[in-house]
Design a protein with these regions (language model features):
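A glycine-rich helix N-cap at a beta->alpha junction
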Residues: 59-86
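Short, glycine-rich nucleotide/cofactor-binding loops
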Residues: 10-23, 55-56
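Short internal beta-strands
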Residues: 39-44, 82-86
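A short aromatic-anchored loop/beta-hairpin motif
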Residues: 74-78, 83, 92-99, 104-113, ...
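Short beta-alpha junction loops
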Residues: 45-48, 89
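Short, flexible loop segments at the rims of nucleotide/cofactor-binding pockets, characterized by
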Residues: 58-63, 98-102
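Histidine-anchored nucleotide/phosphate-binding helix
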Residues: 23-37, 41
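N-terminal beta-loop-helix "entrance" segment that forms/cooperates
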Residues: 47-62
Length: 124
């Protein structure tokens, strides 16, 4: 007889593009994914630019911090989702083709439906 393992959902919201906020979001997202949680990484307009190809790499080699691309890849490998609020595209002058391949551009209302039932929320 097999027991069903309960899957928990963790929501990480990032509305800033500074190193402290972004790295905190990535670290918590990777930690939650490593514990088996389904992770939703939601970036609001203030944090939108970090999902553009080449931006996360700028946070590499920060003293005492892990490699942001390692964290990003870890979350992705463990089925984490990367969601950008659609308002971030025009607000920050981003071209959709410049976003990382894994990024979904969604309305905030769609994200809220996806986040339903989450047991943990973190905002940076």
């Amino acid at each position: 007889m097999s027991e069903e393992m309960e899957i928990y959902k963790t929501v990480i919201m990032c509305n800033h593009s500074d190193a402290d906020s972004v790295m905190a979001a990535l670290i918590m997202g990777a930690a939650a994914a490593a514990t088996g949680d389904l992770v939703l990484m939601f970036f609001q307009p203030g944090g939108a630019k970090v999902l553009v190809k080449g931006e996360l790499e700028k946070f590499k080699d920060l003293p005492g911090m892990p490699d942001p691309m390692y964290l990003y890849d870890s979350i992705t490998t463990l089925d984490g989702r990367w969601i950008l609020c659609e308002l971030g595209i025009p607000n920050k002058g981003i071209n959709k083709e410049d976003l990382r391949d894994e990024v979904e551009v969604r309305m905030a209302s769609d994200f809220l439906l996806d986040a339903e039932g989450a047991t943990k929320y973190f905002s940076y």
